[in-house]
């Protein structure tokens, strides 16, 4: 991975790194020394702002075992990590077993107890729409997270991915399929309870207290350029998307031979529009009509009209200060989801896609 960082430094030669994210796989298995090695390579090959957001993804079962020495969180902090993303999913044994998670309720709570002693910037993942999860248990799940004092929650509806253990269980009648009506009820509870506890619903699946939004994911949602390092990692610029090969042995071999182990595709204007629409509609910032290519602007306004009439979307007029002049303001029209439309954001975006 250090070799890939070195080979790709020209891609961001004119950019400044603001966030670093250790995610995918099980990055929490990295030692303090391995994290330091990667961060050193980033600082040596790229321009990095002072105090960038550096997030590490971790699961409770990994952390609770390694935290027995009570040093793992201190080591992460010393290595440079300043934000933790912990895949709790649920604080209840029944849910964790049904989702085939490796950790249990006790480990989830122990992990957060230790983590909050060393980090104040922590996000937890929670899953809703789990069959047999009552509305009351979902409220309790959220309350436990609030009681731990976490400042950010990422929450997603349970989905059954093809060719997974859960998929097999559902097909064989061993596990009920998720119910969309229940998921919608849980989503409404999630929105209401997080708001009561001072969280801002700034992206469909993300809730943060002021100053604790995920800077890394926000950059992604706002269409900023990023590069992904390691097998299967994806990268994005406004006009291109690339992805690394998944096979570890082939990935290493290509780099040893001085080759970049990736494939790429050029994004058409339609692709760029659809990408912006999909991410923009999920956020509180919406889709700026000023940023939409002129050739697609009126088509978007026209095609969104039926969803506006149904109370799912709204176009708001906003005044923003000009970046080039403090005395000048720019008028903009911004397409956003309404409270009623939030749960349907992805479906609404796909209905508005431009397909050639």
Located regions from the model:
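Short amphipathic alpha-helical interaction segments
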Residues: 295-309
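Intrinsic disorder/low-complexity segments
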Residues: 66-71, 316-334
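Short, amphipathic alpha-helical interaction segments positioned at domain boundaries
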Residues: 340-356
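A short, conserved structural fragment
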Residues: 308-318
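Hydrophobic residues in beta-strands and at strand termini
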Residues: 58, 337-338
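C-terminal scaffold of the Radical SAM
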Residues: 2-11, 15-296
């Amino acid at each position: 991975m250090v070799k890939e960082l070195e080979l790709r430094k020209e891609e961001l030669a004119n950019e400044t790194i603001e966030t670093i994210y250790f995610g995918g796989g099980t990055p929490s298995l990295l030692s303090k020394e391995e994290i330091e090695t990667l961060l050193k390579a980033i600082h040596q090959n790229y321009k990095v702002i002072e105090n960038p957001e550096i997030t590490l993804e971790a699961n409770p079962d990994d952390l609770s075992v390694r935290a027995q020495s009570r040093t793992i969180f201190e080591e992460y902090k010393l290595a440079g990590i300043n934000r933790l993303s912990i895949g709790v999913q649920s604080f209840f044994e029944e849910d964790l077993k049904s989702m085939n998670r490796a950790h249990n309720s006790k480990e989830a709570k122990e992990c957060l107890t230790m983590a909050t002693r060393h980090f104040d910037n922590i996000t937890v993942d929670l899953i809703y729409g789990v069959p047999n999860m009552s509305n009351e248990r979902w409220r309790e799940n959220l309350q436990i997270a609030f009681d731990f004092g976490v400042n950010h929650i990422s929450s997603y509806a349970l989905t059954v991915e093809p060719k997974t253990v859960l998929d097999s269980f559902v097909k064989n009648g061993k596990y009920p399929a998720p119910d969309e009506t229940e998921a919608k009820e849980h989503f409404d509870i999630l929105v209401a309870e997080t708001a009561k506890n001072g969280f801002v619903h700034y992206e469909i699946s993300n809730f943060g207290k002021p100053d604790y939004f995920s800077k890394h994911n926000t950059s992604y949602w706002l269409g900023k350029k990023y590069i992904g390092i390691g097998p299967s990692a994806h990268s994005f610029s406004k006009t291109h998307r690339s992805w690394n090969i998944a096979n570890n042995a082939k990935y290493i071999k290509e780099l040893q031979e001085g080759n970049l182990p990736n494939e790429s595709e050029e994004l058409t204007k339609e692709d760029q529009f659809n990408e912006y629409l999909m991410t923009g509609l999920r956020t509180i910032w919406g889709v700026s009509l000023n940023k939409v290519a002129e050739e697609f602007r009126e088509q978007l306004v026209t095609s969104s009209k039926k969803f506006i009439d149904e109370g799912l979307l709204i176009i708001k007029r906003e005044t923003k200060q000009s970046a080039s002049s403090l005395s000048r303001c720019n008028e903009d029209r911004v397409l956003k989801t309404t409270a009623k439309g939030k749960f349907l954001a992805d479906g609404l975006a796909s209905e508005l896609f431009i397909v050639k």
